[in-house]
Amino acid sequence: MRGRDSEVGFQDILPGIRIKTLVHGEKTLMSKFLLRAGSELPLHSHPYEQTGYLLSGRLALRIGEDRREAAPGDSWCIPSGVAHRAEVLEDAVALEIFSPAREDYLKFLNAEDILG
C-alpha cells in the first residue's frame, strides 16, 4: 500500500486533536496528528509500541515517569503498555507509527489518499 498526504480526511478524536492514518502494512501503521495549542492527550496506555516524530510545534510529553518537552525534529519511542500523555504547548503536527498495526486506526484512512 502507498499513500500520499493531503490536507483533507482528518477526523476529530478529542477536542483540538485531529488524526489521519497515512499508510499501514501487516505489522505497522503510520498516522498524522494535527494538535491545537492547549489541547491534551490524557494519560493512557495500549499494547502497541509507538514511535513519534514532531514536525512542528511544541509538546510536553510524559512517557512513564519521564517528562520532557519536544520541539520540531524530536522523536520518541513509547514501549507497549507504558502510560503516556501529551500536552500541546503550541499548534503542532506529529507523525506516529504503531506496531503492531492498530486495527482501530484503520477507520482514519482517507480513501482519496491511497495510491495502491
Question: Where are the predicted features?
Answer:
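Short acidic-glycine-tyrosine-enriched beta hairpin
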Residues: 65-80
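A short, N-terminal "cap"/entry segment at the start of jelly-roll beta-barrel domains
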Residues: 1-27, 110-116
